[in-house]
Design a protein with these regions (language model features):
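Short glycine/serine- and small hydrophobic-enriched flexible loop segments
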Residues: 29-32, 148-153, 203
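Residue-level signal for inorganic ion chemistry
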Residues: 21, 43, 65, 82, ...
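Short beta-strand-centered segment that lines the nucleotide-binding/catalytic pocket of NTP-utilizing
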Residues: 14-25
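A conserved, hydrophobic alpha-helical segment in the catalytic core
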Residues: 55-69, 101, 106-109, 135-170, ...
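Flexible active-site lid/hinge loop adjacent to a nucleotide/diphosphate
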Residues: 34-115, 124-134, 298-305
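ATP-dependent carboxylate-amine ligase
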Residues: 152-157, 163, 167-171, 177-319
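A conserved segment at the C-terminal end of the G1
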Residues: 1-15
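A short helix->loop->beta-strand "cap" motif at the edges of active sites that frequently abuts
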Residues: 93-98, 115-119, 237-238, 260-263
């Protein structure tokens, strides 16, 4: 959503700064530049929002997209504390400020005990039918609608917004279409580090009637409930390749039990072997989806970005 908003604003000729939880961009480096720009578009995680809470400030326009359990190791399983940090994005709003809320997160906000002073906007679920948007999945279309509401608030015409959205392409690691090899589509969804994110990815590129997804999954333990994802995998997947790691160990037995449902299941050590296995078993017309659902930390990668870079390199070198 952050990149969508930034793309719309830039396309409309606005001078902006993009920062926050963005790869290769240090928020500290941007502080001197912000005064020279008219707008700052920041993606803020719960840790960054802790700082907003310490300073008792919230952005004048806030977009709260979704809320799912994450970072439960750090929060010691306290989902209320996690939401409390996230809530700093709107907690210190004034009457003139704006909170744009995704439909999924609305019940959590309604249960929140604090008073919200700003105006709340809940976008429509779909873009106008005549608009062409290239990213797969209903969640991406809804993300686009969140960005549309920001543009409208800033008096950017729908005509300019439409033109910007129709030129937007997928971001690295976020349901990024890499290539088609021998009739097999390959998607890099490396940024999906939670079970909920992987479920959304399966729904975006999969089909419950066809079951043509070859899923690559696994990583380090994030202390999240994997039960819903385990229930969803058989609906979309013909094959699953497990990437051996500490988190993967927790779901191995249940994933291997899918063999009783006619789903082929394998486990490999190292990303290169895992990807090669997926390509060796995938058939023409199927889709290989790399959506880990776990942390990147462990012995194989420096960080999440390194994991994604390695996957892209391996896929590009395949013949």
């Amino acid at each position: 959503v952050t990149h969508l908003i930034a793309h719309i604003l830039k396309s409309a000729g606005k001078k902006i700064i993009l920062g926050g939880n963005i790869r290769g961009v240090s928020g500290l480096q941007l502080l001197k530049k912000i005064k020279n720009a008219k707008m700052a578009v920041f993606e803020l995680d719960s840790w960054q929002l802790q700082g907003f809470g310490d300073s008792k400030i919230s952005p004048c326009i806030s977009v709260f997209t979704t809320f799912f359990p994450d970072h439960m190791g750090y929060y010691k399983g306290n989902i209320k504390k996690y939401f409390s940090d996230k809530a700093h994005i709107f907690k210190y709003h004034k009457n003139k400020d704006l909170l744009i809320v995704g439909k999924q997160v609305l019940p959590f906000i309604q249960k929140w005990g604090g008073k919200i002073k700003s105006k709340i906007v809940i976008p429509k679920e779909k873009l106008p039918k005549s608009w062409k948007f290239n990213l797969p999945g209903m969640h991406n279309e809804y993300n686009a609608m969140l960005a549309v509401e920001v543009a409208r608030t800033l008096c950017i015409s729908d005509k300019k917004t439409r033109r910007a959205l129709e030129s937007f392409t997928s971001l690295p690691g976020r349901l990024q279409f890499l290539r088609k090899v021998n009739g097999i589509k390959v998607y890099n969804d490396n940024s999906s580090t939670t079970p909920d994110a992987t479920i959304v990815a399966l729904q975006a590129v999969g089909d419950v009637k066809a079951r043509k997804v070859v899923l690559i999954i696994g990583g380090d333990n994030k202390f999240l409930d994997m039960s819903e994802l385990i229930n969803e995998i058989p609906k979309f997947c013909s094959k699953v390749v497990l990437f051996k790691e500490r988190g993967t160990d927790l779901i191995r037995d249940k994933i291997f039990s899918f063999r009783n449902k006619g789903i082929a299941v394998y486990e490999e050590e190292g990303l290169k072997s895992t990807v090669k296995r997926a390509f060796s078993i995938a058939k023409r017309g199927e889709t290989i989806l790399y959506s880990p659902a776990f942390f990147s930390f462990g012995k194989h990668f420096k960080n999440e970005f390194d994991r994604g870079d390695q996957f892209v390199k391996i896929v590009k070198n395949l013949r």
